[in-house]
Amino acid sequence: ADKRGESYVINGAKHWITGGGISKLHLIFARVYENGEDRGIGGFIAIRGEADGLKIGAREPAMGLRGIPETEILFEDLEIPAAMAVLPPEGLKRGFAGLMNAYNAQRVGAGTVALGIAQGAYEHALSYAQEREQFGRPICEFQGLQWMLVDMSTQLAAARLLIHKAASCGDGQFPDVTEAAQAKIFASETAIRVTNDALQVFGAADYSRNLPLERMARDARMFTIAGGTAQILRTVVASQILDRKLPQTRDGYAKLAERAKSKAAER
């Protein structure tokens, strides 16, 4: 976003916008430049239909979660008046930190949705295992399948407790960075495991698109990706439990060491 007088002009594009083309109000986070100098990150409000430079791209043919569109949004000389800018009170340099804090709350919600998908898949599998008969008895009486159902129920119970802990945040202010990340990691990976095992319980019967489990398996896959991948969230948790920033750039550690050495010399 280039600051030009009392306005900000945004050019660029953003992919995988959930609800793109449906939502009227758009909150855009962009890096702000003034006279060619990077000032930090700020938020900008644009209203679809009233902002000429806001364009909605094609809908992505998504693998799952097809109930709401995922689109590209294009910014072509999108002019935002200063009155529609959402700037951090601490200054633009704190804009990225504020954006990431908003993600922490979203992660608890995403983990909850993943848990709901997994719970639904488990309930379908549990019911089917008691109804489906093979070799003269319900398949739930076979020990191997019992173990699968027990593992599914155990993982669901653990995921639910992590989400409740992150949502209640009894030890501090919501959202807690570590608890939100832990809840999303475990719940999202549980959703993939449980939907996959539920498919196995059904066998060929649920490999069909006529039954809901194939949709659940597709929907579950997104939750280890969106809102921070499971791998990035592990880095977030690591930085919290080690109580140190973990740079992701090739020379990040060297820069931190130089900064620490410089501060020590100043003392």
Give the location of each predicted region.
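Long, acidic (Asp/Glu-rich), low-complexity accessory segments flanking structured domains
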Residues: 76-97
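Flexible, small-/acidic-enriched active-site or ligand-binding loops
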Residues: 52-79
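Short, acidic Gly/Pro/Ser/Thr-rich loop/turn segments
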Residues: 17, 35-37, 51-53, 80-85, ...
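Short beta-strand/turn micro-motifs at beta-sheet edges
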Residues: 62, 86-88, 136-137
